[in-house]
Regions:
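Intrinsically disordered, low-complexity, repeat-rich regions
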Residues: 1-157
């Protein structure tokens, strides 16, 4: 995999996740909904771009970091951008999001895919995935992690 000699990478690099006509852009909404700074959300979008490349070019199933997964989830909400623009024109492939079905075998499968994704990232992009976005597997899949999206304005006391 060499993204710099690949038309797919050229198309991904040119793809703009933000519609400049929007009062609240994709990246701004990603930041707002996750309590991130705009700068951090911009970094997440770039890592999402890299993940999309790996999803099509790696020879194995890929699993995103939690932060990259949040970008993917939000992008799926922008259905025309995701399906009509990204998948149809840029990726030229329908990329479906497959969540876990639960259970130990699924946990093992996603852990293995996450480790393989980070390895492919290193080989493809020639650097370590940023640790604050792509944490070690034991952090990403920590058993004590219990993720839940909550409206803090309505439910924080």
């Amino acid at each position: 995999m060499n993204p710099h000699q690949d038309p797919l990478w050229d198309r991904l690099s040119a793809f703009n996740f933000d519609d400049t006509g929007d009062a609240l852009t994709f990246t701004q909404r990603l930041a707002r909904e996750n309590g991130w700074s705009l700068g951090f959300a911009q970094r997440i979008v770039e890592e999402y771009r890299r993940f999309l490349y790996l999803a099509l070019r790696a020879s194995h199933s890929v699993t995103p970091s939690d932060a990259v997964d949040q970008a993917w989830h939000l992008h799926l909400v922008y259905s025309r951008s995701y399906w009509d623009n990204l998948c149809a024109q840029v990726l030229q492939h329908r990329l479906h999001h497959g969540p876990t079905r639960g259970g130990q075998s699924e946990d093992d499968r996603f852990l293995d895919a996450y480790e393989a994704t980070r390895d492919s990232y290193r080989r493809c992009f020639g650097s370590e995935p940023p640790a604050d976005i792509w944490p070690e597997p034991e952090v990403r899949f920590a058993p004590q992690a219990r993720w839940q999206r909550v409206d803090l304005a309505a439910h924080w006391y």
